[in-house]
């Protein structure tokens, strides 16, 4: 079985192709193009325009890289949510067009579930406590009774979004990442003094908006590297407190980190210490799968297709607020 997957939930348009043969799964292609705004944040209309322009190019590149054509494809998987509406619509439209034109099954995929599943596949995690950390999501989850249950999450903005907004407003970005290192880490590593900022954890839930607002107000008053250092340390320590509490509650001895923030070296260092203290194993999704990508959609689509999870074209509406705990998982 060969599945083509389309990702377009935010700033990335990606296409992945995954093949299963003789119970062996291989990722044949994982091609993407990410939109970086010249200034400011992401504007939905600009994202949609980027995706429309890149879609035919990325689809062709993926097929060429995989050395297959659409006749070889058994199903088209697409991320229908959560995400930014105009961006989601482009991916959904491309997926519908391919499915109709080549008479292929259409497979609905939840973007967050795809992040988790590619993490499970690439790290060989078995039954972990999952930290899903990205620009739009900060979720602590486990799998139980056919669903990924949420044990903790952000009460307002996501960890990744908070950090991105801060470095942008501080004049450090774009670009947000330089040679694989986020601007917050580049700046924070020069900091020496801790600046007191809001630290808000409620049970296993976190709130990052107060931290962001307070840090921005200090930009003209304190040394920038010190503010960066304090923002990073407080933000990650909030997550660690919630994570440790969730580990105690669930009894898990394995931590899986997925999503774009999983690439943070400083967060990895903190989580390694936490895992060691609790006798747990830390597993982090490889960098090529941490950010948004088409391979994770194709892989999750493959799992879904094997359990006959398809959707008619007329019902393939986008779901910008589609939570991971609302998705039934028949393959686990």
From Swiss-Prot:
Q: Which cofactor does it need?
A: Fe(2+)
**A Gene Ontology BP annotation from the UniProt entry:** tRNA threonylcarbamoyladenosine modification
**Which parts of the sequence bind substrate?**
132-136, 164, 185, 264
Q: Which GO terms describe its cellular component?
A: cytoplasm; EKC/KEOPS complex
Gene3D superfamilies associated with the record: 3.30.420.40
Q: So what family is this one in?
A: Belongs to the KAE1 / TsaD family.
Protein name (Swiss-Prot/TrEMBL): tRNA N6-adenosine threonylcarbamoyltransferase
Q: Which organism's genome codes for this protein?
A: Sulfolobus acidocaldarius (strain ATCC 33909 / DSM 639 / JCM 8929 / NBRC 15157 / NCIMB 11770)
For this protein's source organism, the top of the classification is: Archaea, Thermoproteota, Thermoprotei, Sulfolobales, Sulfolobaceae
